[in-house]
Amino acid sequence: MIPIKKGAEPPELKELRQKAIEKKLSPQNAYDTLKGKRKGIVRQSLLQEQGHLCAYCMCRIPRNDVCAGIAPIRIEHYISRNPNDDRDIGQGLDYENLLAVCNGNIASSDHNHKFDDLTCDAHKKNTDLHKVNPCISETLESIFYHVDGEIDAYDPDVKTDLVEILNLNCPKSPIVSEREAALSELILNMNDFQGNDLINYCRISLKSFQDEQDNKTPYQGILIWYLKSILDKLTKSKT
């Protein structure tokens, strides 16, 4: 998971949100007014600021393996529009509360799937995350990865968010093996360098990933983490 820098609210959404406030619509009813061209504009705005990566698992969205009848991109409400405590803070059309996410490993449109096989917001549903918020970088600082592609965290609340609520290590989803494959490719490229050349390669690669805007490299979170950890080891060994 990587930090998301929210951009400006699309004017089309602002207009709709103000009307919803005037009509005192519930978060769900307010969101139901977002449709057609307006919804497409909001979706595209979210995709661009996230570099076409899922806010939670970092896969490319839309994925190219989504079954017919399944929405390849979902608009997620960080604070659910139907929260378990029924709170209403205008979250239905609050742009700061909206994220673009993948289909969450939903295999078919007939709902013939197991809950434990789902990921991201499809598994999160209306549950509040304890701490993780991709729009607040400080909440992501304890995250680390394993070379087999699994995501983890030193902070137990963050780990619960990642592993239990978002199910980002789901064995039935391709995301773990895809994270592992992305890291393996990076390590293979690093094997061509040694000493100062390796340090320079890692620094250049790290900056390249961090500077990406739209169409970011899928699963770059594990790549950035690995490059930082290797650079830390290499620079410490030289002191």
Q: Which residues fall in each region the model found?
A:
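Catalytic cores of phosphodiester-bond-cleaving enzymes
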Residues: 3-8, 15-20, 32-33, 40, ...
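Short, charged surface segments at domain edges that flank catalytic/cofactor-binding sites
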Residues: 3-56, 84, 89-93
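Hydrophobic N-terminal alpha-helices or hydrophobic patches in metabolic proteins across all domains
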Residues: 50, 60-71, 165, 175-178, ...
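A structural signal for short, well-ordered beta-strand segments and their strand-loop junctions
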Residues: 55-56, 74, 100-101, 142-145, ...
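Short Cys/His-rich metal-coordination motifs, predominantly Zn2+-binding knuckles/fingers
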Residues: 57, 105, 139
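Histidine-centered nuclease catalytic patch
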Residues: 60-121
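Long, low-complexity, intrinsically disordered segments enriched in glycines and aromatic residues
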Residues: 112-172
